[in-house]
UniProtKB/Swiss-Prot annotation:
Binding residues for ATP 1: G62, A63, G64, K65, T66, T67, C207, C212
Catalytic activity of the protein: sulfate + ATP + H(+) = adenosine 5'-phosphosulfate + diphosphate; adenosine 5'-phosphosulfate + ATP = 3'-phosphoadenylyl sulfate + ADP + H(+)
Listed name of the protein: Bifunctional 3'-phosphoadenosine 5'-phosphosulfate synthase 1
Protein family (similarity comment): In the N-terminal section; belongs to the APS kinase family.
Region (Adenylyl-sulfate kinase): 1-225
Keyword Cell wall biogenesis/degradation on entry: no
GO biological process: 3'-phosphoadenosine 5'-phosphosulfate biosynthetic process; sulfate assimilation
Gene3D superfamilies: HUPs, P-loop containing nucleotide triphosphate hydrolases, Sulfate adenylyltransferase
Length: 624
């Protein structure tokens, strides 16, 4: 390639190189790639398919371009869509740092950005640009650069009135422009030419960031850039209101299969959308993907590590095989319809070995599996009515959709989830408080805690849900956790005690409900081996597995630091091995013993009112 002639001094570049005395290269030939876009699309991102395009955000300073672009980038990456944001301020610190704000420099600024965006799009990325780009001709040129390369280009006008932009004025630029300290400032003494026919207009003065992002995502879905299933919208399986009467009439006439309480809990999990994108109990293909890969693979890599299955006896199979649909009956009531059922063999030993890593018959959930029928039934589930347990706790059983709305109503910009099946002590609280503090330090303004106890089946020696909820309420009442930034809700899933395999399920379910961060601690979903008494799973593996698990890309894992009772400080504190003698590890066994005997724990271990609830629970056992 010919090197341009030397220049006597450094000059700013405009679109017309001749004006600056530059010699153009005349022996440049475009080199065609050996790799096609389709081939490149197969290896870029986690979903496959070429998605290269440019989303060109334009608008006044302060309109919200950077805010929307960064949020859109985060959303797409979290949903397996490769993308990158080119921000105006960032580009002017590097590639375009030799350009000013004259009309000529603005033109060259946009030209360079358009060329770079084209390369990103050609590489298979969704390239998001965030620039004022005030002139129609420059934006049209950017579009032509993409169209000349047969790449989609979407102009998005980020529209906010000038007075709103001035009120925001994060950088103080409007104030300086009004004072005459900045000349040629767009919107003040330099014109902004509004787009005449953009693909999308975002009214950022009336729509929040999430709404704006969803509008752009919908545009990309309409243009086949982003797959519809990439949005992970909650898939509820309740029959729509306008079809409910017909479905109930149908259910009464169908053959029936009786289900037990744990089955009913799984029906609730499916109905409320926790297992999105499942349409019902797993069919054989989904079951095999789950059992062997801990993921669903049709439509992208979606983490789903535990089989959600319905079992049947040989007699049930003989009676129902060949039916196009049958009703599920719980305690004499027809609660759902399973359509297009598929029967396949329930290989119990293989399932247990893969799901739990053991086939120990004394493991409480494995014991249930071994007692179940020899057949599994997959199918499309239609649930007739919302599921209530009438135990005084239904108000806490918020669905993923309801939780998302609640977080929105609270103006949460980050949601961190804490899953638990035990009472909360001050060590747990320390971790939650510290996570909240870290999120504030990272720039989040309104982090919200989802305190999300497991509400399905648990083994006999676990504290029952009703008592745990009383204990959690006492923790909030005493101010150990802030009620203003905490949502307490119940997760309806049964507990399987499957360690690192199950903790992926716990995590991804909270992801569906809108959590961005998930706190994981020592031995999550674990228990002592029923025969040896040792940990069934290595205590640190759950956290390690979560940080590596495929398909958990919309949230960040927050590993526990080990908390113990600091005898000197008389409070729960992060364990320091250099001062081991200052710390005491209070086991669950010792905690239960103290509560059972009505004794008080060490000062600062648990909120007093919360401890009183535990004492009352163990007293109730003695009376029983």
């Amino acid at each position: 390639m010919e090197i341009p002639g030397s220049l006597c001094k450094k000059v700013k570049l405009s679109n017309n190189a001749q004006n600056w005395g530059m010699q153009r290269a005349t022996n440049v030939t475009y080199q065609a790639h050996h790799v096609s876009r389709n081939k490149r699309g197969q290896v870029v991102g986690t979903r496959g398919g070429f998605r290269g395009c440019t989303v060109w955000l334009t608008g006044l300073s302060g309109a919200g371009k950077t805010t929307v672009s960064m949020a859109l980038e985060e959303y797409l990456v979290c949903h397996g869509i490769p993308c990158y944001t080119l921000d105006g301020d960032n580009i002017r610190q590097g590639l375009n740092k030799n350009l000013g704000f004259s009309p000529e420099d603005r033109e060259e600024n946009v030209r360079r950005i358009a060329e770079v965006a084209k390369l990103f799009a050609d590489a298979g990325l969704v390239c998001i640009t965030s620039f004022i780009s005030p002139y129609t001709q420059d934006r049209n040129n950017a579009r032509q650069i993409h169209e000349g390369a047969s790449l989609p280009f979407f102009e998005v006008f980020v529209d906010a009135p000038l007075h709103v932009c001035e009120q925001r004025d994060v950088k103080g630029l409007y104030k300086k422009a009004r004072a005459g300290e900045i000349k040629g400032f767009t919107g003040i003494d330099s014109e902004y030419e509004k787009p005449e026919a953009p693909e999308l207009v975002l009214k950022t003065d009336s729509c929040d960031v999430n709404d704006c992002v969803q509008q752009v995502v919908e545009l990309l879905q309409e243009r086949d850039i982003v797959p519809v299933d990439a949005s992970y919208e909650v898939k509820e399986l309740y029959v729509p209101e306008n079809k409910l009467h017909l479905a109930k009439t149908d259910a009464e006439a169908l053959p029936a299969l009786k289900i037990n309480k744990v089955d009913m809990q799984w029906v609730q999990v499916l109905a409320e959308g926790w297992a999105t994108p499942l349409n019902g109990f797993m069919r054989e293909r989904e079951y095999l993907q789950c059992l062997h890969f801990d993921c669903l693979l049709d439509g992208g890599v979606i983490n789903l590590s535990v089989p959600i299955v319905l079992t049947a006896t040989h007699e049930d199979k003989e009676r129902l095989d060949g039916c196009t649909a049958f009703a599920l009956v719980y305690e004499g009531r027809r609660v759902a319809i399973l359509r297009n059922p598929e029967f396949f063999e329930h290989r119990k030993e293989e399932r247990c070995a893969r799901q739990w890593g053991t086939t120990c018959k004394n493991h409480p959930y494995i014991k249930m599996v071994l007692e179940q029928g020899d057949w599994l039934i997959g199918g499309d589930l239609q649930v007739l009515d919302r599921i209530y347990w009438n135990d005084g706790l239904d108000q806490y059983r918020l669905t993923p959709t309801e939780l998302k709305q609640k977080f929105k109503d609270m103006n949460a910009d980050a949601v961190f989830a804490f899953q638990l099946r035990n009472p909360v002590h001050n060590g747990h609280a320390l971790l939650m408080q510290d996570t909240h503090k870290q999120l504030l330090e990272r720039g989040y303004r309104r982090p919200v805690l989802l305190l999300h106890p497991l509400g399905g089946w648990t083994k006999d020696d676990d504290v029952p849900l009703m008592w745990r909820m009383k204990q959690h309420a006492a923790v909030l009442e005493e101010g150990i956790l802030d009620p203003e930034t905490t949502v307490v809700a119940i997760f309806p899933s049964p507990m399987m005690y499957a360690g690192p395999t199950e903790v992926q399920w716990h995590c991804r379910a909270r992801m569906v409900a809108g959590a961005n961060f998930y706190i994981v601690g020592r031995d999550p979903a674990g228990m002592p081996h029923p025969e040896t008494g040792k940990d069934l799973y290595e205590p640190t593996h759950g956290a390690k597995v979560l940080t590596m698990a495929p398909g958990l890309i919309t949230l960040e894992i927050v590993p526990f630091r080990v908390a113990a009772y600091n005898k000197k400080k008389k409070r729960m504190d992060y364990y320091d091995s250099e001062h081991h003698e200052d710390f005491e590890f209070i086991s669950g066994t010792r905690m239960r013993k103290l509560a059972r005997e009505g004794q008080k724990p060490p000062e600062g271990f648990m909120a007093p009112k919360a401890w009183t609830v535990l004492v009352e629970y163990y007293k109730s056992l003695e009376k029983a």
